[in-house]
C-alpha cells in the first residue's frame, strides 16, 4: 500500500533541490526511490548531487536539452516530469507516484498522514493535502487553501468535482497511483496551468482526496524557474 516513488524536476536551484530531496528521503514512511530530473542545468554542482546526498534511493535523470529549448515556450515543467514518469512506468513500478517541486519541502509525516487518510479506499487514485505558504526568505504567510488560524473542521475532503472548475491540488503534495498514470499518459506542455490540466484529466478517471492538514511548505514569490 505504502510503496511510492518521488519525482522532483529541477533546473539551476541546487541548494533548494537538496532540501527537497532530503525532505523526501527522511519521511517517516520513506519512498522506494526519489527521481530527480535535471533540466539541463548550467550549475556544475548537479554533477555530484548523488554523491552529496549519499542515498542508494536517489536516481538523477539528466536531460541534454532543456525544456525551454525543446518546447520553445518557456520552462515546461510537465515535460521535465515526464522523463521520470516514463522511467517509472518502463521499470514496471506499481504503486504511488508523488510530485515535489524543487523549491518546496515536505513535513516529515506527509506521506504517512496521506496513507492513513486513504486507508484501503480504492475510490481515490489521487491524494493531496493543504500546505503552508512560505516566501524565499523562509517566512510563513498562512495556509495555501483557507486562512491560517481558522479551525479546519473536516480532516479530509473529496475535491474531485471541484477540479473541473478550479485547481484544488497543490502539486507538491500530490500522489497519483501508477494505474492512473498509465491511463493519463504524459503531462501536457500547455504552459501556465499544465498542473491543473493533469489533475482535471485525472478527475475524470478517479477520485481526488485532499487532507486539509498542511503537510508541506509551498514556496511563493520565487521568480526563478519552476515555481508555478
Language-model-derived ranges and their functions:
Residues 1-23:
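N-proximal low-complexity "stem/linker" segments adjacent to membrane-targeting elements
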Residues 22-31:
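Short, acidic, metal-binding catalytic loop of nucleotide-sugar glycosyltransferases
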Residues 32-40, 61-64, 101:
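Short beta-strand/loop segment that forms part of the nucleotide-sugar
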Residues 38-49, 65-67:
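A conserved acidic beta->alpha catalytic loop
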Residues 66-91:
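Glycine-rich, basic loop-to-helix element that forms the pyrophosphate-binding segment
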Residues 78, 150-228:
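Conserved nucleotide-sugar donor-binding catalytic segment
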Residues 93-103:
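Short beta-strand-to-loop acidic/aromatic patch adjacent to the donor-nucleotide binding site
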Residues 109-143:
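Conserved donor NDP-sugar-binding/catalytic core segment of glycosyltransferases
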